[in-house]
Structure formats: structure tokens, C-alpha cells
Amino acid sequence: MKKRFPTLLATLIWTALYSQHTLADLAEQCMLGVPTYDQPLVTGDPNQLPVRINADKTEANYPDNALFTGNVIVQQGNSTLTANQVELTQVQKPGEVIPLRTVTATGDVNYDDPQIKLKGPKGWSNLNTKDTDIDKGKYQMVGRQGRGDADLMKLRDQSRYTILKNGTFTSCLPGDNSWSVVGSEVIHDREEQVVEVWNARFKIGKVPVFYSPYMQLPVGDKRRSGFLIPNAKFTSNNGFEFLLPYYWNIAPNFDATITPHYMERRGLQWQNEFRYLLAPGSGTMALDWLPNDRIYTGPDGTDKNATRWLYYWGHSGVMDQVWRFNINYTRVSDPAYFTDLTSQYGSTTDGYATQIFTAGYANENWNATLSSKQFQVFTAAGNSNAYRAQPQLDMNYYKNDVGPFDMHVYGQAAKFTSVNPTNPEASRFHIEPTVNLPLSNSWGSINTEAKLLATHYQQDIPASFADNASNPKLKDSVNRVLPQFKVDGKVVFDRSMDWATGFTQTLEPRAQYLYVPYRNQDDIYIYDTTLMQSDYSGLFRDRTYSGLDRIASANQVSTGLTSRIYDDARVERFNVSVGQIYYFSRSRTGNTEAIDNSNDTGSLVWAGDTFWRINDQLGLKGGAQYDTRLGSLTLGNAIMEYRRDADRMIQLNYRYASPKYIQAAVPKVYNPDYQQGISQVGTTASWPIADRWAIVGAYYYDTKAKQPASQLVGLQYNTCCWAVNLGYERKITGWNAQGQTSKYDNKIGFNIELRGLSGGHSLGTAQMLNSGILPYQSAF
């Protein structure tokens, strides 16, 4: 054993070092077997360029023909033809200025130009047009992957087209025939960057696995109608899956992708995506349609062969520099859609689908936005009580430099309706004039602000809601007027650091006083308001709640201190911030929730954030919040990440949310997993482990529930012309109320991808990491 130890140690060291280089760059590896054109390019009209012929022996019948034998080299411009024997024929046609010059070559014929190399036993070439034929030969593209053979190879239109009779095409390097496409006719169009194949047979090795009377393969990044690279995978949930996307280049500003997605256990899904570019902006529309899902039986288990669908519309644009249009609309057929079916337009962790339309106008000192907002919540209770704002009008008017003051007026009008007819509905009108006195210089600033918050509610309260004693007692008409006063000051001190040449440290104390009087708001229902997360920057917010339904009283001072360190290139290397809110009187709105029912005053809320970029590869980031009203640490997170490059990364993280904070932020939570709080520790990593092999993994463990929250491991092998990855994922998808246990979904999947048809040669680690229920997010 002792004798073997040095060998084992050397092997481990070699593997670690080799994985760091992985032949340095897979793209460079894949170009090792690709020919390049390394001669100086000749410019000018090819037909006007001279023809140069070298040979061991020449027999000429001037000017009609000549026979060259022995190491024959024919050159014209950037084209070169070599052979054992070449016959040059020249025919002067009546009315033609330039004679027709052709060559017939036999014996070890080779043709090359900046785009392609041809090789065969016999060939013919028109020196005027560069049309070239090679019998029973082989070809290889120059400067990019792509090769094959054919009974007859033709070059046409100055080598734009390569036409093969009974030919093959593959992106694999010479000596590797892992896959190929065979056709009775194959046409490669270099300008359009596409290969068209008739009577196509797709082969893995020597075994044909797929037939199509016609097929297109893209061999570049140019937009072109045709079939894209197929994809196959297997999951325990869906069985064998096969996707064959078709790209439709409709017009310069329109295109679409139509993808039949076969799932062995569920059926055939059609994934359709349409993209456009118009004067009002650009956008994407998508419709995924699964007409008869053989597994899904609906929320109540009685809907057999249910039709499942997804519709998405995303749009963003500016027109005439003043009009702004935005759409973010996603709707699915059922709450379990993202749990069962994979989509780039949502995931189970979102919890809801957003449906927002906005149209806005912006001028020099005012803007207006008209919007429609609705949410499809994926929990039964949430979806049955969701509210929509249809319509909502927001307006802003700005007037700066009115003497020493800046003015701002914000107004809103919104109509709230509920998907549940037994819930209250309301019209809300709000106006918020603000006057600021900003003062600043090179080392500090102070801003004094006064505003008036005036809101009117006209509520429609159903009788069934009003008669329920457990519901709040609402009023049909409510007026709420609240003044607000704020003073916010900050000073920045900086100094050069003695122990680090060129480094600068700053010290930035900040203090803010905020006053808002108390107003009991129990007579107003909650339509669009939730408790906001309180991190360090949140200490200096005006509001405790989002929306306008709850405006908490305030008589408080927020203080904070931030220190930053910049290197000699002014890159921030370190910062730390800590702050607190001191309450002179308790903050309240009138309701009886835990966070609002405390009589405590003094320093109640503390928050801190820190970030440390140790070097360009290693960094730390974290934050914590403490609320004495809840008597606990409310939120916390910490991340340490080492990222060497796009494929080499290790991240450790921890996140925490106290049960009291969750109950205060989301009062109606019945899942025991959340009622006891969140305390999750996890790690995410990706690393090449050997030549062309890469592994990724993610593991999150809930220390409160004492169970894994998510597990992911993936292994990918990459070559120059194909890649395969195998992955396993286990994730929580719901709560089993009957068994009082978490529901898990186990997924085993594999994907096969053809490589070399475009410029990408990544190891695929990013795609694998983003496929998990908790996608990787960079820490810095």
C-alpha cells in the first residue's frame, strides 16, 4: 500500500491540475482538427486573376488544351487544385471576351479555398465560375466544424453552395463518427448558414435512428427557417421525452419557434413561441398546449385527460421617446402546471403568475401610467381571495428648483375587484404632494421633506362579509389624511489606508427622523398591502407596508453607519453597514397583528449588511435583521462563494426567517413547514472533474423541519460534436395535509445535445444549475 501511495497521490494531483486546464478551452480543442486557410487572401475579380500551373511534365496543344502530369498544382486567386494529372481545356465561344477554361483532374485530387477542402480520385473545375465537381470524395469545412463524403460533390456560386449526391454531414472531427446525417441530396448554403437534407437518415454511429423526407440543420448563428437541434431526455415523472424545435424566420422583425414535445407518460405537448419587433417595442408570445394529460387528474382528482396550457406575453418598448409600453402576462391552466411541466416562463418557487399590462407617457416634468394588475396564486386559498387592480392610474408631477425647494405630486386612482364575490371591493383615490429641501456638498447631504398623504376609499361590502363576526368591521366610505415629515442626513468621510497602497476607506454615518401620526385603519380592507422586508436599506424607508391600505404611524429616528474600502482601481472590496430604528412611540395602524400590537418603544429594529470581495474569485456576503417587537432575529442570510470562472464555482449559503416574522408578513399560512420558520443551509457547486467531464450539485437542508428541501446532482460529458448529461433532482412540491408530511418529486433525467453546429462549446454547467427548483444566483 505504501508503494502505491505516491502513484495515487500523483494521479489525484494530475486530475486536479488537468481539470483546471481541461485542455484550457473546449472550443480550442475542437478547432485542432479543423483546417484553416493560412495563405494571404487575394482580392479582386477571380475571373480576371491569372491561372498558375506547376507540374513535372507538360504537353500542350496551344491554345486548345494542355496536359500536365506529376505533382500538378493549379492556382487561381484563393483557389488551389492539386492532382497527379490535370487536363486544361480552353474554348473561345463566339461573342465571349473571356474563353471558357476548364480542368479535368485525376489521381489524388485535392481542392481547397478559404471555405472548404475537397478530396477525391477525380475532379472537374470551371476556372471562370469556380464551379467544381469531385467524384466519390470527402469534404471538410475550413475554419469551422463540418465534414462528410458523397458519391458526387459540387461547388457552385463561388463556393457558396456545396451540393452532395448520396452524401453525409457531421460536425464531429475526423476519426469520430458519433453521429451523422445521410441524405440522397445534401445542400450546404454558407451564406444562409444552413444544411438542407433530402431523404434524411440520422445515424448514431452506423445505426440509423430517425428518418425525415426533408431536414434542415443550422450551421451558424444566422437566422434561418428550419429544424433546430433535437433534444431527448428521460424523467421519472414524464418518462422518455423528445423535442424537435422548428425555427421559422417569418420576416426581419418576426420569427417563431414551434416545438413538438413528446412525453411518454403524458402525451404530445406543442410549445409555440412568437417574437416580434415593432415601433411600440419588442416582445415574446408563447403558448404551450398539452391537449390530454394522461397523468394529471385536476385539483380534486376527478378530471381525467385534462387539457393543460400556458400563455405568456412579455413586451417592453418606447415609442416617440415619450410612450412606454410593458406587458408581463403569464397564465396557466392549473396551480400544479409548473410542478409537473418545465417552462422558462415560471417555476414552482414563484408561488404565483403575474398578469400586468402598463401603458405610460413621460414628459419633461410629469408622467402617467395606466395599468391592469392581476395575479394567479397557486395555492387554493390564495387564488380564491386574490385581488386585481383594473384599472390603476398613477401620475407624477415634478417641479424642481422652486427657490431652494423641489416639489413632487403623486396621485393614484385604482379599482380593486376580487375573484371571490364574497370579498369586499373598492375604489381608491390617493394624492401625495411632497416638498423637499435638499442641501449637499462634496462630503455630505441633508434632505428635509414634508408630504401629505390623502386617501379616499369607496368600499362595496357584501352582506355575507359584513354579517360574519370574524371579519373586520369596514365602512362604505373612508377618508384618511396623514401628514408626514422627514429629515435625512448623511456624511461621507474618506482616508487613504496606511497598510494598503492606493486603497481608500470611507466612513458614512447616516441619520433620519420620520414622523407620521397614528390613524386607526381597521375600517379599510387590505387589497394590495403586505409587510415589507426590513434590511439595512429598509431602515430608512418611509413605509413599513407596501401599497396604500396600511400606513403605519411613526415617531422614530433611524441611524446607521457604513464603511467601505475601495482598491486602487476604485473597485469596492469591502463594506459593512449596521443600523437601528429608535421608536419614541409605537408604530401601529390599528389592527391586532403581532407586529402591530406591541407597546414597546426604544431601539426595536436592528439590521446589518456586509460584503467582502477577498479577491476576484472569493467573496462573502451576509445580512441580519432583529425586531424586538417579535422578540427574535427575524431574517438572516450568509453566502460565501468561490468562482474561478464560468464553470468552476463553489457556494455555501444559509438563510433564516423566524416563524413570528412569517406569521406577521403572511398571516394566513397553514403549512407547518412555514409555521415553524425557515432555517436552511445549503451548498451549490460546479466543477470540471476531468477532460470534458463536469459535475454540478446543490443541496439544501431545512434544520427546522429536519429534512432536505432540495437536492440536485448533474454530470455532463462534452465532446466537440455531442454532449450528454445525467441529472437527479429531489424537491418539495407541496404539503400532504392528510399525512402531515411534505410532498417530494424525484426526477431522473438525461439530455443529449448535438454540438459543433454553432459557436458554443460551454461545459453546460450553467444550464444544469439553473434547472433546479432553487436556481443558482451569483453572490457577486
From Swiss-Prot:
Oligomeric and partner information: Component of the lipopolysaccharide transport and assembly complex. Interacts with LptE and LptA.
Family: Belongs to the LptD family.
HAMAP family, per database record: LPS_assembly_LptD (MF_01411)
Claim: Nucleus is one of the keywords in the record: no
Species of the source: Yersinia pseudotuberculosis serotype I (strain IP32953)
Keyword entries, A-Z: Cell outer membrane, Membrane, Signal
UniProt xrefs under PANTHER family: LPS-ASSEMBLY PROTEIN, LPS-ASSEMBLY PROTEIN LPTD
Single GO BP term: lipopolysaccharide transport
Highest taxon of source: Bacteria
Lineage, opening ranks: Bacteria, Pseudomonadati, Pseudomonadota, Gammaproteobacteria, Enterobacterales
Residue intervals passing through the bilayer: none
Compartment(s) of residence: Cell outer membrane
Protein name per UniProt: LPS-assembly protein LptD
Job of this protein: Together with LptE, is involved in the assembly of lipopolysaccharide (LPS) at the surface of the outer membrane.
InterPro entries: LipoPS_assembly_LptD (IPR020889), LptD (IPR050218), LptD_C (IPR007543), OstA-like_N (IPR005653)
Cellular component GO terms, alphabetical: cell outer membrane; transporter complex
Gene3D superfamilies with a match to the protein in the record: Lipopolysaccharide (LPS) transport protein A like domain (2.60.450.10)
Signal peptide location: 1-24
